[in-house]
From Swiss-Prot:
Assembly mode: Heterodimer of an alpha and a beta chain.
Major subcellular location class: secreted
Natural source organism: Coregonus autumnalis
Domain of life: Eukaryota
Protein name per UniProt: Gonadotropin subunit beta-2
Length: 142
């Protein structure tokens, strides 16, 4: 009976090793994709919804089975390699508020460590098109 269990375990392990590259290849690679994003600012009653390229996709990563308090785990994420910034003017802002908002436009992406200065590195962040105020579509959207 033990031989049957060990044999089944070995077959399962073999299939996991064999199919691992297939599973990774079925996932979208790290690349720029068009995403609906909301732009808003305190003092402006309107949330402007635009489409812009962001970085999204799968990055291959490994984690040690045996963890040591002396080892550091580095997780690679899909993040900006080359980026350009664009500025847009929000409508109906209060007179004392600068209506301009600057946002990143992904030109190319890379699997690398998350840079907290330019990226949201949280496990679960807000959706990129979430608005706290009234939504308005930017010209040319849909």
């Amino acid at each position: 009976m033990l031989g049957l269990h060990v044999g089944t375990l070995m077959i399962s392990l073999f299939l996991c090793i064999l199919l691992e590259p297939v599973e990774g290849s079925l996932m979208q690679p790290c690349q720029p994709i068009n995403q609906t994003v909301s732009l808003e600012k305190e003092g402006c009653p309107t949330c402007l919804v635009i489409q812009t390229p962001i970085c999204s996709g799968h990055c291959f990563t490994k984690e040690l089975v045996f963890k040591s308090p002396f080892s550091t785990v580095y997780q690679h994420v899909c993040t900006y390699r080359d980026v350009r910034y664009e500025t847009i003017c929000l409508p109906d802002c209060s007179p004392w508020v600068d209506p301009h908002v600057t946002y990143p436009v992904a030109l190319s992406c890379d699997c690398s460590l998350c840079n907290m200065d330019t990226s949201d590195c949280t496990i679960e962040s807000l959706q990129p098109d979430l608005c706290m105020t009234q939504r308005v579509l930017a010209d040319g959207m849909w």
